[in-house]
Swiss-Prot record:
Domain of life, source organism: Bacteria
Protein name per Swiss-Prot or TrEMBL: D-mannonate dehydratase CC0532
Organism: Caulobacter vibrioides (strain ATCC 19089 / CIP 103742 / CB 15)
Residues marked Important for activity and substrate specificity (site): 315
Recorded family membership: Belongs to the mandelate racemase/muconate lactonizing enzyme family. GalD subfamily.
Length: 403
């Protein structure tokens, strides 16, 4: 038995808020897990401190599956983003500990490497099409084989995915939600022009992706997918609200553009219909919000039965702890598709020293025992929590809409 004697929650804001769980065993071995829920961080802090940490003390850190089931099945109020994010933090930390005890990187404990590295995609964005293309050219020069393109929409003051003042993209930047204006018609008119220009400049030897961010109806998404077919996107992401699973059937019937969804999914039930009916090509569920490595491995295995690949969320709303965990997961599964990689700020990287590295369009998790990531608690303490909310959208007539 490897008894857990301490578990503490650390909140830090090196440019944005992150929540980290650190578990310590009686032998002095520590493991870290990410518990960040973007814009709702303190809800997970409370859930961990009030409901999970007391039940962790005294348990055997080796019993990862049993502890996972204890917190999931043992709770009548199972599931949901807060509980599953908290559970993911516990799961990551326990896998980190198990790897350190074994003296092996976690991917070796998950069955070993299925590939030499994890192919990632970067984010190129700009206020105009030409700004976006210029950024994409830089990513291609850095070795990226896949790039997500987002650009400002003419007639709209702000657009999802476009950074402010050329800084790292961070939508949750105000004490209270910023209200933005959205126009589907203007958006649908602009996106095909972006990808037409992208293919002219970038050529056909790089994968291109786009994120709609849940803002279309199924028929609108079908029309967009059809319009984008000539440019052979790797995927069209979150084209309709993720809970509208039946809507993907209509989209699928009208376009061959590959579809991706799932970064807000918490468990397999959220994606069951999409996977079984092969209504999507890529599942975007993440280690952070789907209950950790233990649960996501099961979801990926189910997806593999139906020829659906993974494409895990990897924006900066998750810390380098999740990024490391995602890479070990990605290395170990047969149906890996692509991994999102949005670079963290230097301040964040300093707080979370990590072993993973980027080269030739791929991330490599490294071979340090465990997850290969840690938290500098002294440095983290110098960056106190700062409340920040995600924006909200209204239509041009004032109607509240999806962000």
């Amino acid at each position: 038995m490897l008894k857990i004697i301490d578990a503490k929650v650390i909140v830090t804001c090196p440019g944005r808020n992150f929540v980290t769980l650190k578990i310590t065993t009686e032998d002095g071995i520590t493991g870290v897990g990410d518990a960040t829920l973007n814009g709702r961080e303190l809800s997970v802090v409370s859930f961990l401190q009030d409901h999970m940490v007391p039940s962790l003390i005294g348990r055997d850190a080796h019993q990862i599956e049993d502890i996972w089931q204890f917190f999931y099945r043992g709770s009548y109020w199972r599931g949901g983003p807060v509980a599953m994010t908290a559970l993911a933090a516990v799961d990551m930390a326990l896998w980190d500990i198990k790897g350190k005890v074994a003296g092996l990187p976690v991917y070796q404990l998950l069955g070993g490497a299925c590939r030499t590295g994890v192919t990632v995609y970067g984010h190129a964005n700009g206020e105009t099409i030409e700004d976006t293309i210029a950024e994409a050219v830089k990513y291609k020069a850095m070795g990226y084989k896949a790039i997500r393109l987002q650009t400002g929409v003419p007639g709209l003051a702000s657009t999802y995915g476009v950074s402010k003042d050329k800084m790292f993209y961070e939508p949750a930047d105000n004490d209270l939600p910023t209200e933005n204006i959205w126009s589907t018609a203007k958006y649908l008119n602009s996106v095909p022009k972006l990808f037409e220009r992208a293919r002219e400049v970038l050529g056909w030897d790089v994968h291109l992706l786009h994120d709609v961010h849940h803002r279309l109806t199924p028929i609108e998404a079908a029309r967009l997918g059809k319009d984008l077919e000539p440019y052979r996107l790797f995927w069209l992401e979150d084209s309709v609200p993720a809970e509208n699973q039946a809507g993907f059937r209509l989209i699928r019937q009208h376009t061959t553009t590959p579809l991706a969804v799932g970064e807000i999914f918490a468990h397999v039930w959220d994606a069951k219909q999409l996977i079984e009916e092969q209504l999507i090509d890529y599942l975007r569920a993440t280690v952070l919000h789907a209950g950790g490595i233990t649960n996501l491995k099961k979801i990926a295995a189910f997806a593999d039965l139906h020829h659906v690949k993974t494409g895990c969320h990897g924006a900066t709303d998750l810390s380098p702890v999740t990024m490391a965990a995602a890479l070990h997961f990605d290395m170990s599964i047969t149906n890996f598709g692509l991994q999102e990689y949005m670079r963290h700020t230097p301040e964040t990287d300093a707080v979370f020293p990590h072993a993973y590295t980027f080269s030739d369009g791929m991330l490599h998790p490294g071979d340090k025992p465990g997850l290969g990531v840690d938290i500098d608690e002294d440095l983290a303490a110098k960056h106190p929590y700062k409340r920040a909310y995600l924006p909200v959208n209204r239509l041009e007539d004032g109607t509240m809409f999806n962000w």
